[in-house]
Structures are given as C-alpha cells and as structure tokens.
From Swiss-Prot:
Encoding gene per record: rps2
Cellular component annotations (GO), alphabetically ordered: chloroplast; mitochondrial small ribosomal subunit
Family designation: Belongs to the universal ribosomal protein uS2 family.
Protein name, UniProt field: Small ribosomal subunit protein uS2c
Protein's cellular compartments: Plastid, Chloroplast
InterPro entries (UniProt xref): Ribosomal_uS2, Ribosomal_uS2_bac/mit/plastid, Ribosomal_uS2_CS, Ribosomal_uS2_flav_dom_sf
GO molecular function terms attached to this record: structural constituent of ribosome
CDD domains referenced in this protein's UniProt entry, alphabetically: RPS2
Source organism, top-level taxon: Eukaryota
Principal location class: plastid
Biological processes, Gene Ontology terms: translation
Amino acid sequence: MTKRYWNIDLEEMMRAGVHFGHGTRKWNPRMAPYISAKRKGIHIINLTRTARFLSEACDLVFDAASRGKQFLIVGTKNKAADLVSRAAIRARCHYVNKKWLGGMLTNWSTTEKRLHKFRDLRTEQKTEGFNRLPKRDAAVLKRQLSRLKTYLGGIKYMTGLPDIVIIIDQQEEYTALRECITLGIPTISLIDTNCNPDLADISIPANDDAIASIRFILNKLVFAIGEGRSSYIQNS
C-alpha cells in the first residue's frame, strides 16, 4: 500500500480539540502510549500518534476506494449522527446513524429481507399505492416505512457486506465492532482515552465527544475515499 501525503496539520487538530481526552479517572490503561500529558483532570492525546494513524487510515481507504470497494460509516450518538450522514453521502458510502440493530451484519440474510421490504414500501409510496388501501392498513404500512427509513435509510443501496467499516466512537458502537471482528471485516475506529486500542484494525486516537474533532477525522477519511474513487473511475 503506497503512503501518501494527506495534509494532516497538528495545529488544525488542536483548534478542533482533537487532543482532549476523557477525565483521568475514566481511562483505559492500554491507551497510555497514545497519551502525552494530564491537564486539569483530563488526559491529553498525543496528536503525533493521531496524525500517524489517521494517515494510515487515509492510505487504506484510498487504496480500497481505488479498487471499487464499499464502505460503511457507523456513528449513532447525537453529536455524530448528522456528521456521519453528510460525510457518507459526500463520499457515496453507506451509513448507520440512528441505531445499530443487533445482527445487522452477522445476520445479513435478515437485514436483506428488511431492505427488500423497505424498497417495496418505498415503491408503493411513490406509486401512490397507499392511497388505494383502507386508511388503517395504509397507516400501518406508513409507520413501517418510517421505522425502516430511520434505521435502514443509510444502507438502502447496500447489496452485500461492506469491505471496510469506519466507526465513530468505539464504546458507543461496540456491537457493530464485534460483528465486524466476527466476520473479519476490516475496521477503522475513532477511539478516545477510555477505549481499547487493540480491537480495530486501525485505531485513531481522538476526542470522540467534540463535533469539531469528529468532523476533522471524517473530513480527512472522506477526502481520501473521494480521491480513491476518482482514481478507480479513471482507471476503469
């Protein structure tokens, strides 16, 4: 895998608050190599390490995108949800930003059935099929469609398991991470000072609470995916 330059600036990361970890009482000792200091009761993340692993992650997604691989971005907590959907749409990736339904990947056949149901209901709505039904039946189907859209809207075009999964906040998305590990799907995970850095294939130490920090990490990854996709189109 070729190493590239991704313009990851330490000062820009500091302005985004990427270096602020959790309180010193709330930490995972395995994160010690990624922590540079303690300040006012919180751990400070070593941004040189962040830059290194973010660069590695950008190289990985560029390489995968240049070969036409598919990505899934997962981030369901309120602070991350909008950022995840915008980033995924920009990079033409699949995403989950509301709730991870257990077995979404490990029980893919069930997820596929739900997606087929979702597509059928969307078609029915677009062709005004609901209008031809009794009001009560139409209301039930509309509720079903609304629920499916909430939880599966970001993966509605996914036809198989993703090649790489990007996880925003490892603690929050632990179930998704375990499913990826079970299936052998490569993962890139944003980890704060309370996380285990040994679980994901590439762990990026960073503040997972600040919107600016999450945005910074996502923007770099999405840019790399976009560059890789452009390379794929040019070479195909």
